[in-house]
From Swiss-Prot:
BP GO terms, sorted: L-tryptophan biosynthetic process
HAMAP family in the record: PRAI (MF_00135)
Cross-referenced InterPro entries: Aldolase_TIM, PRAI_dom, RibuloseP-bd_barrel, TrpF_fam
Gene: trpF
Annotated organism of origin: Pseudomonas paraeruginosa (strain DSM 24068 / PA7)
The protein, known as: N-(5'-phosphoribosyl)anthranilate isomerase
Family indicated by similarity: Belongs to the TrpF family.
EC numbers on record: 5.3.1.24
Amino acid sequence: MPAVRIKICGITRVEDALAAAAAGADAIGLVFYAKSPRAVNIHRAREIVRALPPFVTSVGLFVNASRCELGEILDAVPLDLLQFHGDERAEDCEGHRRPYLKALRMKPGDDILARVADYPGAAGILLDTYVEGVPGGTGAAFDWSLVPAGLGKPLVLAGGLTANNVADAVARVQPYAVDVSGGVEASKGIKDAAKVRAFVDAVRSRGRDEA
């Protein structure tokens, strides 16, 4: 199995971004959703992205943002990848000069494969826990056995991941990448460097065990 990529989401401070990169994370996530306790403004986001070392991907997370709002942010912040967590249609996610991920919440009864097919231009699909009215960052895991085979796109696994369960999640789901936020925090929006290192080590050790 190829190395699983790791994204540390909900970064709000330069020092947390640098700690994530130093621990071996492949990407960091910046939340542009005002209702989130992990939201960042344009100035802070630009500061964080500019501080990143080479080969660490910067990801912007959006929830039903207008095209005007997206344009303003993308003109100011050199993001590499966009991640859409709301009710966006494919046409809302495209045309921003960046590849994108579409997050789908594992709502009971939903046909995930059919929903994936609605986003043919997506670079990947992120599967997250469904909690009514909450677009992400719930801190709760979902039943990984519900992940369907044959998504046809790189799968990013999110939802309630921690250093204690991520190796099991990787073994069972075999995702392209894992995405964590609350599972590596000291408090909302503030990362715990030791938890970040432990999370990355848990993912990497799983890969070493399989080598």
